[in-house]
């Protein structure tokens, strides 16, 4: 197979763009009472995700957002917006658990 047969429409490469959308999920486990840290973690759903989605839309780019289940449970609106704009969501654990500390159950 030649390169011309592999790449459609004259394209010569591809790029996969992904984001880790954690919000404050890691902080909830590590520092649940640190209000300043929790506030910083809310920047993603309230400011960063809308800006990123608008930028991706402007350029016609689709991306994958790897997101912990805790973020989906607690910031449902922003996750639904990601999907409604045609992006993919991927699993990223539930709450940044330390796997070595989890029981087999």
What are these regions (language model features)?
Residues 1-105:
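Catalytic alpha-helical scaffold of carbohydrate-active enzymes acting on polysaccharides/glycoconjugates
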């Amino acid at each position: 197979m030649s390169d011309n047969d592999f790449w459609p429409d004259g394209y010569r490469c591809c790029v996969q763009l992904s984001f880790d959308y954690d919000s404050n999920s890691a902080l909830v486990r590590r520092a649940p009472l640190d209000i300043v840290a929790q506030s910083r973690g809310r920047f993603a759903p309230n400011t960063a995700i809308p800006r990123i989605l608008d930028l991706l839309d402007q350029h016609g780019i689709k991306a994958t957002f790897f997101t912990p289940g805790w973020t989906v449970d607690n910031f449902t609106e922003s996750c639904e917006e990601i999907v409604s704009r045609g992006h993919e969501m991927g699993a990223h654990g539930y709450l940044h658990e330390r796997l070595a500390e989890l029981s087999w159950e």
